[in-house]
A protein has these predicted regions:
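Beta-strand elements of repeat-based all-beta scaffolds
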Residues: 2-412
Length: 412
């Protein structure tokens, strides 16, 4: 199918662009969409011609406020006519008639954003479509604050993280962030549930706080996000961890049960590549990259017990060629291929299913998956027991004739 603009013509007072997505090469049918534009060149109405279950056209009105924001009011789509292509100049009446007849909904056929009266133009309130939200005064409300040190609701802890060794990270709760150091967005949804999002000066989320009210008591469910000096995410501390933190105390990822069971921890090399990931309840997973920043080796905790590494070796174009398991002795914190570009090349190497590898030697390698590109010569080179004739091309009159060089750049 192709999207081909076939008309750009003025009609009435508005220009429009008609696009047809053909479903076959006869161009006898297809999906047609028309977009009308106002005098300023902004889309004002989109029509999906004849796409409803009764071949009616689906209309999508687009309106703007005084500052040309198209999301201040987002009208619901409606069906009208039979394969109609003309712009509906009285869409508000058509919209009201459609929803009143089909859904008994007579007002508020749109969602609405209410903006604050400031040059920042931030959203203050959001209403969903339908009159029920209005009658219940149920909207999503936003307010914009800053943190206050020591305040029960607007306080944010400050952390210091150090790496003691390859598998140990120490976390220290170093008091509170200074007042007005962080921006806070308070969100109250339609059910009066409140979420606070704290961001630093680099627009990074450092704390997400969900306030829970239960039998007159209030609980802050805090998720902290910790970054290093290079803005890399170092740790995520969910509520099960943050609830047990005490100001002035230090915690080790090896000895703290809550950190080991619930925290997300990350390690990086000198090039800011993530070389270590610790998920809740899991051992560290290590990653090793080559000079071209391609992931070559990875190892889970279970593989580490067996002395195994998982490898994925690319060709010169960066395409994965062979994947499997090996038993190399690798120190992920002293990368042996840091300054080496690893690549695969097609040969008649039967042990690696038709590939030879430069840049790294594989010990006791077991290839689990091999991928081939560009042509079908691998049938002669991969050393498998598959009969070559079973992989030969068979012409079929129901399909187009094969173009012999069409596989260039593709996986075969």
């Amino acid at each position: 199918p192709q999207n081909i603009p076939i008309e750009i013509l003025p009609i009435g007072r508005d220009n429009y662009i008609s696009t047809t997505n053909y479903l076959d090469n006869t161009r006898s049918g297809g999906r047609k969409e028309i977009t009308y534009y106002n005098g300023l060149g902004y889309p004002s109405q989109k029509i999906e011609v004849g796409t409803s279950n009764k071949n009616k056209s689906i209309y999508h009105p687009i309106v703007y406020d005084n500052l040309l924001r198209d999301d201040a009011k987002s009208y619901l789509p409606y069906a009208q006519g039979s394969n109609t292509e003309m712009k509906d100049w009285k869409f508000t009446e058509s919209l009201q008639d459609f929803y009143a007849f089909n859904y008994k909904e007579y007002t508020y056929h749109f969602s609405e954003k209410v903006y604050e009266d400031s040059p920042l133009g931030r959203v203050r309130e959001v209403y969903g479509p339908g009159s029920d939200w209005r009658s219940q005064k149920a909207s999503t409300k936003f307010s914009y604050l800053s943190n206050i040190a020591g305040n029960d609701t607007l306080n944010c802890l400050r952390f210091e993280m150090t790496e003691k060794d390859n598998q140990n990270m120490e976390l220290k709760v170093a008091g509170n962030c200074k007042s007005s150091e962080l921006s806070v967005t308070r969100t109250e949804n339609e059910d009066r549930q409140v979420t606070l999002e704290f961001k630093n000066k680099f627009d990074q989320v450092v704390l997400s706080r969900q306030i829970e009210h239960n039998n007159g008591s209030k609980t802050n469910n805090d998720t902290y996000y910790l970054y290093d000096e290079f803005d890399n995410l170092k740790a995520v501390l969910p509520p099960m961890v943050s609830a047990q933190l005490v100001s002035g105390s230090s915690y080790s990822s090896q000895t703290s049960a809550s950190l080991a069971q619930y925290a997300y921890l990350y390690k990086y090399d000198m090039r800011n590549r993530c070389i270590g990931t610790k998920l809740p309840g899991c051992s560290w997973e290590y990653k090793v990259y080559d000079l071209a920043d391609r992931l070559i080796f990875s190892q889970t905790g279970e593989q580490r017990k067996r002395g195994e590494w998982q490898f994925a070796l690319p060709d010169a174009m960066g395409r994965e060629c062979i994947m499997g398991i090996c038993k190399n002795a690798i120190d992920p914190f002293n990368n042996p291929i840091l300054n080496t570009c690893v690549k695969c090349e097609r040969t008649d190497n039967a042990s690696l299913l038709g590939y030879s590898v430069t840049g790294v030697a594989l010990n006791s390698a077991t290839v689990l998956t091999a991928k081939y590109y560009d042509d079908y010569q691998f049938k002669m080179q991969n050393g498998t027991l598959i009969s070559n004739s079973s992989l030969n091309y068979e012409a079929n009159s129901e399909f187009g004739e094969r173009y012999t060089t069409s596989s260039q750049g593709l996986q075969t």
